[in-house]
Amino acid sequence: KNLFFPVNIAPSDKCTIGGNISTNVGGLQTLRYGNIEDHINGLEVVLSDGTILNFLNKLKKDNFGPKLWKLFCGSEGVFGIITRASLKLIPKKKYNSTYLIQTNSLNKSIRLLKFLRNKYFDNLTSFEIIFPIPSSYLFNESTHHFNLIIEIQSNVIGNYKKELKKYFNLKEFKIYK
């Protein structure tokens, strides 16, 4: 209850946990929560000769040598196929604010990212930069924009919009509460 798996993959209805682990995906909230490898307790894998390796451990504290199951994270199935996984869930934050911002300045976008990471590090979950369509550069159109999608999650209501307005002419996409 009130827990979630923080690796948010865009085509989540089209992928599997084993496939995600074998490619060590990051997802839409990697900025805050890291890659899928950071949210695994253990794995069960099947090698090409049919040998089953069980790295599932019920103990939270496990300081016994290297975590051999980590070899399978990002190996894209080269070492074996992942058949079971024990995943870490984390507490869900109460409030989620999402903003869409347009700017013509990539430098300003990067400065905003640095500002938000310094000020709201524990709450900044996503910062996506969508680059302009390349054809807009070819035809010298002045309407090209960098689109930023920013997501901030918190357990208290914050006035993030005010902070963002310091940097941009904010166009609010949606605020979820």
Model-derived features: positions:
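Noncatalytic alpha-helical scaffold of FAD-dependent oxidoreductases
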Residues: 1-177
